[in-house]
């Protein structure tokens, strides 16, 4: 609680949550209109994660600043964001209102990210969908300029069409777009 003592402390003398708060305070010192939070809760326990998100939400309301949240944590996205832009290998693959994208993901990578999130059930006896992972590995940097779908090697729906050209974004109702020739409801 003693801010003056914390300002003189070394990072190794602080917890992960304290270091994160110092970084947020440093970023906000110049009153930015946009705050870019890149994986702001990585390696923090869930209680501290919730505190950081509460802090960011409070700061957003008080300052009016926009927050760009860069994360793989779809739970964080659901809590913090109004819109989501899902990227894969440096390319936008899906975009839209958060509730809509999480409820009806159109791109296979987005579906994979959402399937990785554990589902909470009321009773331990209730069936829970098994956790899944997105198979394969991210392409090497040499593939990033390729005129094809970079997710195709990891995609269960991939066809020859995916390797033929980079998919153009397709529009869906409600302002949702997905760059996939097989884009559709989950």
Give, region by region, the residue ranges found by the protein language model.
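ABC-type ATPase nucleotide-binding domains, specifically the catalytic core motifs of the NBD
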Residues: 1, 13, 96, 142
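Interfacial catalytic loop of ABC nucleotide-binding domains
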Residues: 5-10, 96, 129
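P-loop NTP-binding/switch modules centered on Walker-like glycine-rich loops
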Residues: 36-40, 44-126
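Charged, flexible cofactor/metal-binding loops and thiol motifs
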Residues: 97-186
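Conserved ABC ATPase "signature" region
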Residues: 1-5, 114-115
